[in-house]
């Protein structure tokens, strides 16, 4: 896939899937701007903007400045997200609200600042990263799953609103992926193997392909959906989970 000369924005680009996606776009020739609350490396092969996606005023300020400096935004990837674990009746109000503020509100803020640009240029692609937790309930993940389900609905609604302008909007829903977020759930030396086998007591199936996804595998799907190879694909949600949701 060739993104030479394309202008691409990726949120959550400091680490994990967002970082892998930003790198993949750079390797494909794109001019990439990555957004995150913090960037811990001294150097990155793409432009970086420190920004809290949950802060609407900050998002507006940064996006308006960047859009004034460019003629076209070819692709937007909403990959910023957080995970707060806890049973529904034990989860703090703060954790619930913060999860929605970042996972749903963050994308909403980016949509609000970029939709007019996409309409004016009559083209482009948006890929939003949800989760297989939006498809299958998980014990202790009510906030995360609910936020990702809301995010999916939001992204597809935006896709319908922009379709008449030739803008494609799709969703990628990863399963367990080898990121810092995933590793916070691993509390034993064999946690990865346990996840692959599944947790019957939690009604959580294993992974038929027998492995945890690599961030690059999620990034590959994102790049495909943003590319001309997917020129007639919009309003779709591709689950990349090694089969763990059994197509649910």
From Swiss-Prot:
Gene3D superfamilies: NAD(P)-binding Rossmann-like Domain. Induction: Under conditions of iron deficiency and by the fur protein. Keywords: Enterobactin biosynthesis, NAD, Oxidoreductase. Pfam families: adh_short_C2. InterPro entries: DHB_DH, NAD(P)-bd_dom_sf, Sc_DH/Rdtase_CS, SDR_fam. Substrate binds at residue 131. The active site is at residue 144. Its EC number is 1.3.1.28. GO terms for biological process: enterobactin biosynthetic process. It catalyses: (2S,3S)-2,3-dihydroxy-2,3-dihydrobenzoate + NAD(+) = 2,3-dihydroxybenzoate + NADH + H(+). SMART domains: PKS_KR. Inhibited by cis-2-hydroxy-3-cyclohexen-1-carboxylate, cis-2-hydroxycyclohexane-1-carboxylate and trans-2-hydroxycyclohexane-1-carboxylate. GO terms for cellular component: cytosol; protein-containing complex. It comes from the Bacteria. One of its GO terms (molecular function) is identical protein binding. SUPFAM superfamilies: NAD(P)-binding Rossmann-fold domains (SSF51735). Homotetramer; dimer of dimers. EntA and EntE interact together. Involved in the biosynthesis of the siderophore enterobactin (enterochelin), which is a macrocyclic trimeric lactone of N-(2,3-dihydroxybenzoyl)-serine. Catalyzes the reversible NAD-dependent oxidation of the C3-hydroxyl group of 2,3-dihydro-2,3-dihydroxybenzoate (2,3-diDHB), producing the transient intermediate 2-hydroxy-3-oxo-4,6-cyclohexadiene-1-carboxylate, which undergoes rapid aromatization to the final product, 2,3-dihydroxybenzoate (2,3-DHB). Belongs to the short-chain dehydrogenases/reductases (SDR) family. This is 2,3-dihydro-2,3-dihydroxybenzoate dehydrogenase. It comes from Escherichia coli (strain K12). The lineage of its organism: Bacteria, Pseudomonadati, Pseudomonadota, Gammaproteobacteria, Enterobacterales.
